[in-house]
């Protein structure tokens, strides 16, 4: 089994990205099989606990207060409401509950509510994860002490291209948050976005940043830009699908023991594209972020694709994604009142 590395160079990664596609996907699948069951995919859902009105100016994001995208702004959900959602999921057999807030960073006044959410979710016996923006060292410790398992904070793009995307926080701010999360003892979820007009070198540089962290992120979301009217990136040209697949494959090769997640943009990928990404080493999806607010035919598409590909939800010690998936299926069939699910990656 190849040794896990933290010393990749941009030149090495560029060379991987430019390999013949068949060779690249073969290498990625070979690496993948050394660390994971190739026919299992991790499934996760996310609940938005606070939506819209974010003060950051990320040019891709419909939640930014800088742009007029028609997104409804919502205040922080009450702790009782969040725990009611968690309890309902628990009663139906859910194993994991993830919460996301559109903040630059949580304020001191927010922390007691967030901590109570974590404690309540953990008291139910559920695995917990959050994405709240930047964290100080002290805030990270508070979340860890409350029992948080995972924290998501993306690097978005390369250090060189970053200034063309965001001006309200620095690249180092993002790295500092990841360091604070890791130092506090939580697991890290960190990835990026492709299709924002970046070069191949920028994609290589992003992957190098992630792979050369002192410890690889446990989860690496690879997002395809979702172009939203009202944002500065609404009119960008589409990224070639094969370039996205190459990014997934190289992420798998560089971070062989991490979950590589198909995240934002997956709803716009056809079945063949998703299957090729799974072949290239993707083994995690946000499964259900839109399922409870869309019509049944769209909701059932994921279930049908898994069946056609012979893919099963991942089995993990202490958690059963088969049960987690069954919760989502049950909710679809019952046609419950809409519950907002939010791709906070």
Swiss-Prot record:
The name on file for this protein is Biotin synthase
The organism named in the record is: Idiomarina loihiensis (strain ATCC BAA-735 / DSM 15497 / L2-TR)
Keyword Transferase in record: yes
Listed GO molecular functions? 2 iron, 2 sulfur cluster binding; 4 iron, 4 sulfur cluster binding; biotin synthase activity; iron ion binding
Free-text remark on how the cofactor is bound: Binds 1 [4Fe-4S] cluster. The cluster is coordinated with 3 cysteines and an exchangeable S-adenosyl-L-methionine.
Q: What is its EC number?
A: 2.8.1.6
- What this chain does, per the record? Catalyzes the conversion of dethiobiotin (DTB) to biotin by the insertion of a sulfur atom into dethiobiotin via a radical-based mechanism.
Pathway involvement of the protein, from the record: Cofactor biosynthesis; biotin biosynthesis; biotin from 7,8-diaminononanoate: step 2/2
Query: Which residues of this UniProt protein bind [4Fe-4S] cluster?
Result: 54, 58, 61
Q: Which gene encodes it?
A: bioB
One Pfam family, short name: BATS
Any idea which UniProt keywords this protein has? Answer: 2Fe-2S, 4Fe-4S, Biotin biosynthesis, Iron, Iron-sulfur, Metal-binding, S-adenosyl-L-methionine, Transferase
Catalytic reaction list:
(4R,5S)-dethiobiotin + (sulfur carrier)-SH + 2 reduced [2Fe-2S]-[ferredoxin] + 2 S-adenosyl-L-methionine = (sulfur carrier)-H + biotin + 2 5'-deoxyadenosine + 2 L-methionine + 2 oxidized [2Fe-2S]-[ferredoxin]
């Amino acid at each position: 089994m190849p040794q896990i590395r933290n010393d990749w160079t941009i030149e090495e990664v560029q060379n991987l990205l430019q390999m013949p596609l068949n060779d690249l996907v073969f290498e990625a699948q070979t690496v993948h099989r050394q660390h994971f069951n190739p026919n299992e995919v991790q499934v996760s859902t996310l609940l938005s606990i606070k939506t819209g009105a974010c003060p950051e100016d990320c040019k891709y994001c419909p939640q930014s207060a800088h742009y007029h995208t028609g997104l409804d702004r919502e205040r922080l959900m009450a702790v009782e409401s969040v725990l009611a959602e968690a309890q309902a999921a628990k009663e139906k057999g859910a194993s994991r509950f993830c919460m996301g807030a559109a903040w630059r960073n949580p304020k001191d006044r927010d922390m007691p509510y967030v901590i109570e959410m974590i404690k309540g979710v953990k008291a139910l016996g559920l695995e917990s994860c959050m994405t709240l923006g930047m964290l100080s060292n002290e805030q990270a410790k508070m979340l860890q002490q409350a029992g948080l398992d995972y924290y998501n904070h993306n690097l978005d793009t390369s250090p060189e291209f970053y200034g063309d995307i965001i001006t309200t926080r620095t690249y180092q701010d993002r790295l500092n948050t990841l360091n604070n999360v890791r130092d506090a003892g939580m697991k890290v979820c960190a990835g990026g976005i492709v299709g924002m007009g970046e070069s191949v070198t920028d994609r290589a540089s992003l992957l190098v940043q992630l792979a050369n962290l002192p410890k690889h992120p446990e989860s690496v979301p690879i997002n395809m830009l979702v172009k939203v009217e009202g944002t500065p990136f609404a009119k960008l040209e589409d990224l070639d699908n094969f370039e996205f697949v190459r990014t997934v494959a190289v992420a798998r090769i560089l971070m062989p023991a991490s979950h590589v997640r198909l995240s934002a943009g997956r709803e716009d990928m056809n079945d063949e594209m998703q299957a090729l990404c799974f072949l290239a080493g993707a083994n995690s999806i946000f499964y259900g972020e839109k399922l409870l607010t869309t019509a049944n035919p769209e909701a059932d598409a994921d279930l049908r694709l898994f069946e056609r590909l012979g893919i099963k939800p991942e089995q993990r010690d202490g958690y059963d994604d088969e049960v987690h998936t069954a919760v989502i299926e049950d909710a679809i069939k019952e046609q419950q009142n809409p519950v907002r699910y939010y791709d906070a990656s």
